[in-house]
Amino acid sequence: MCNDISEILGIKVKNLKITQNLGLHVHKNVQALFYEGQLTYHPSACECCGIKNDNHLIIKHGFRKTNVYMGLIFERPAYLKLKKQRFYCKACQRTFTAETPYIQPRCTISNEVKRMMTWKLSKVTSEKDIAESLCVSPSTVHRHLKVVSNSVKTHAHYVLPEHLAFDEFKSTKDVEGAMSFIYCDSVTHDIIDILPDRRKHQLEAYFLKFSRKQREKVKTVSIDMFPPYIALIQDLFPDAEIIIDRFHIVQAINREINRCRVQVMNGFRTKERPQYNKLKRYWKLLLKAPIDLDRMIYQPYRLFKSWQSQYSLVQYLLNLDETLKETYETGHRLLSALKANDIQQLRFILQDAKTKDTSKGLKRVIHTFIKYMPYISSTMRHRHLTNGPIEGINNKIKLIKRVSYGYRNFWNFRNRILMISKVFVSEYKK
């Protein structure tokens, strides 16, 4: 049976001995556990002048008493009344205090509590909730966040990865631009850095801190269709291929198909209400790929008197308006070519679509695709490099803002994002 209080509490630190259990006492209006301990040893040299401790040159010089917060024990805050040994150096006639890895000098919170604080800061939890769970003040948690965040900052001497992904997100009101900038490694999905402004001149000033040799090593950059990103990459990453994110291409096509449906639907709003209701109810089927529509199984559908299959229902809706039909067919032909990674077929469809009576919105999208065709070709060559990882990171950023009820200061927000993404890395990324 073990009767050593230090071993029972799991404190295995050299030279630190817990001597007594003082029991429960009220501290800050809460019942807390109190222990008494002592820290002493024989120093090998003076910490002030560095002289070796020969012939009793350094002698013991009393104790300094401090209350060290140990964290929660049995769901109660625990404190250690620690007596730290003081030493006197006869050579320099100065005094110094004994030190231990259990607690930092001139600090009253143990390193175990700080490690737990770091772990909780890496989770999507508000700082106030972390402080409450550890029985410390929110300002203590915030100070610790600032200290730990220094270890995850990006510096100009860092090596840029070969594959990058750029994106933006809405951060805080104290930034100058409307959106903030974030970029990550497309392969490992690790955040590299977060900037307060996505405007081109700000990004140029930032990336010019990296040497040209580092920037030339970048092979691909995945982006959405934001024109300043394209100009920036061409200027600063001369050997990098620009990849238009596949999701944004699909989203642009689907959005215009849906907009055309809404325009046609609103035309039937006062004239033919049944057609309006059908277009409104079955909008999802118009966005579904034609090859995935069921043609064999007929069943009753609301608003239809006769049984329909998914395919026949869609054909009925398309026959209501010729523009809707052309927009639907052209849009899904583009999506099919994109899914098959057939660049020649995509080029043919884009040229052929110029003669089709599609909606104005889809014509604008087609014009944009023709303009960005070299970058869309890169999208098809690098089918596994997308902005998907960084879009997932942006979803987590929104979750952090929601849980924390927003942030006022951009740098505090940035530090928290980097803490959550960089402090503890998954095993498969190591």
Describe every region a protein language model picked out.
Residues 122, 353-430:
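Basic, amphipathic alpha-helical segments enriched in Lys/Arg and hydrophobic/aromatic residues
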